[in-house]
């Protein structure tokens, strides 16, 4: 099986595309669009357009190279039973739930399955053969079949994109680390919830303790037809 070498920090990472997955975390209107949950909760989403384009580029490169592509959508049923009641810390810490309690007119609109907020942004569309998974909490490994689906495909390396770097991206990468997956995040294909230092802190944590950090151009270069031809 052919392997590629991806330029990354703190060191390059070598893996086989066929045993790797590109993870697209929560690229929903909720997190990337004006009028979505993050925007209504007071977070800045004005600079997400370049992130969307970079993810689109990464997805195309991964698909061409034969990588598995996994799309996550964060949210709950329209009655929010899956979100947990007052006995769940999620009830108290989810900014979506807190925003709806503060603005009752938004109830049933934020992160509710089937609604506009829950949908992936128009620019990013899964294709047949991609894996599309709902998730009820920050981590894509919690209460989802992600782990078993990856293991069935002998996938050990995960390349992360999406929003928010410091919340769902980092949470999923961390859980993957504990499950013996090698995780690398493409920093220019992610965006934080909060001020810029939240992005910097998340990338520092990942690079130093839990995984690797790269970028979309390096990812595309490693998967280019020329690079793949050299190792064929």
UniProtKB/Swiss-Prot annotation:
CDD domains given in the database record: cysteine_hydrolases
GO BP annotations listed: nitrogen utilization; uracil catabolic process
EC number: 3.5.1.110
List of catalytic residues: 26 (proton acceptor), 135, 168 (nucleophile)
Keywords noted in UniProt: Hydrolase
Catalytic reaction list: (Z)-3-ureidoacrylate + H2O + H(+) = (Z)-3-aminoacrylate + NH4(+) + CO2; (Z)-3-ureidoacrylate + H2O = (Z)-3-aminoacrylate + carbamate + H(+); (Z)-2-methylureidoacrylate + H2O + H(+) = (Z)-2-methylaminoacrylate + NH4(+) + CO2
Highest taxon, organism lineage: Bacteria
InterPro entries in the record: Isochorismatase-like_dom, Isochorismatase-like_hydrls, Isochorismatase-like_sf, RutB
Pfam families: Isochorismatase (PF00857)
Any one GO molecular-function label of the UniProt entry: hydrolase activity, acting on carbon-nitrogen (but not peptide) bonds, in linear amides
Recorded family membership: Belongs to the isochorismatase family. RutB subfamily.
NCBIfam families: RutB
Known role: Hydrolyzes ureidoacrylate to form aminoacrylate and carbamate. The carbamate hydrolyzes spontaneously, thereby releasing one of the nitrogen atoms of the pyrimidine ring as ammonia and one of its carbon atoms as CO2.
Name of the featured protein: Ureidoacrylate amidohydrolase RutB
Organism of derivation: Cronobacter sakazakii (strain ATCC BAA-894) (Enterobacter sakazakii)
UniProt lineage: Bacteria, Pseudomonadati, Pseudomonadota, Gammaproteobacteria, Enterobacterales
Gene: rutB
């Amino acid at each position: 099986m052919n392997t590629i070498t991806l330029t990354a920090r703190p060191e390059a990472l070598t893996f086989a595309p066929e045993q790797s997955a590109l993870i697209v975390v929560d690229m929903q209107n909720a997190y990337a669009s004006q009028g979505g949950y993050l925007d209504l909760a007071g977070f800045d989403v004005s600079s997400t357009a370049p992130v969307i384009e970079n993810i689109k580029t990464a997805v195309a490169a991964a698909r061409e190279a034969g990588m598995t592509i996994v799309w996550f959508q964060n949210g709950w049923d329209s009655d929010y039973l899956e979100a947990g009641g007052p006995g769940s810390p999620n009830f108290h810490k989810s900014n979506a739930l807190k925003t709806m309690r503060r603005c009752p007119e938004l109830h049933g609109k934020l992160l509710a399955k089937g609604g506009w907020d829950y949908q992936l942004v128009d620019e990013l569309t899964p294709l047949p053969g991609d894996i599309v998974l709902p998730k009820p909490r920050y981590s894509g490994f919690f209460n989802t079949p992600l782990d078993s689906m990856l293991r069935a495909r002998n996938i050990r390396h995960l390349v992360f994109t999406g929003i928010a770097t410091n919340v769902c991206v980092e949470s999923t990468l961390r859980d993957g680390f504990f499950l013996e997956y090698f995780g690398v995040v493409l920093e220019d294909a992610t965006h934080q919830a909060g001020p810029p230092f939240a992005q910097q802190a998340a990338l520092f944590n990942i690079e130093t303790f839990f995984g690797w950090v790269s970028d979309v151009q390096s990812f595309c270069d490693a998967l280019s037809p020329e690079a793949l031809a050299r190792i064929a």
